[in-house]
Amino acid sequence: MPDAAAWVVAGPPGAGKSTVAGLLLAALRPPPALLDKDTMYGSFVAAALAAAGRTPGEREGAWYDEHIKAHEYAGMTATARQVRSHGCPVLLSAPFTQQIHDASRWQSWAAELGGGTVRLIWVRSDAATLHRRLTARGSGRDTAKLDGFTAFTASMRLDAEPAAPHHTIDNRLGAGATLEAQVSTLVRSLADG
C-alpha cells in the first residue's frame, strides 16, 4: 500500500490554522481526511470543563494539559494512525506546541502517527496578529487567552521556529504574500520535489 501522508498544521490558537488547513484540503490530491482538534473535541472539552467546575475559556495551563489536552492529542494521534493504516492521508490541525518545539518528541510522535511521510506546516504569527484575530473571532474558548495575553503568547513561543523539519506559512499582519499564494507555492514545491 502506498504511503498515506500525514500533514500537521500547527501554530498558536488564532494563527489561522483552520484557514491554512482548508486551503491545503482544496489543493492536495487526494485530499486528506481532516482531523481538527476543535471539531473533534470542542463540545467534549466544554462539557469536561463544566463538569470539573473549571472556567469555560480555560484551554491552557497545567490542569488542562494533564486532564484534557493529553487525551485530545492521544485521540487525534490514534485516529490518524488508524486512518493512515488504510491508505488514506490525514491532515491534523491543532497547536501541537510541545511536539513541534522538541526534535526528539517530534520524531517519537511522527512514529506514533504511523511513520512514513509526516509534513509539518507551521503557521507563523505574532502577538499583534493573534490579539487582533482572537478578539475578532469572539470565541468563549479564547477568553482566558485574552485575559492573560502576555503569559499566553509567551507559552506559545511565537519567536521560536519549530525544532522539527517544517514549512512555514506566514500569517502575520503585513505578511509578504497571501495565504492562498503561500499554500499554492508550498504544494507545487512538494509536488516538484
Give short role names for the model-derived ranges.
Residues G22-A74, R81:
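Conserved substrate/cofactor phosphate-moiety recognition/catalytic segment
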Residues R132-Q182, L190-G193:
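Small-molecule kinase domains that catalyze NTP-dependent phosphoryl transfer to phosphate-bearing small molecules
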Residues P12:
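P-loop (Walker A) phosphate-binding loop of NTP-binding proteins
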Residues Y64-G114:
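Glycine-rich phosphate-binding loop used to anchor ATP phosphates in small-molecule kinases
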Residues V9:
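Hydrophobic anchor at the beta1->P-loop junction of P-loop NTPases
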Residues A15:
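ATP-binding Walker
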Residues S18:
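Walker A/P-loop
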Residues L113-T135:
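Conserved phosphate-donor/acceptor-positioning beta-strand/loop module used by diverse small-molecule
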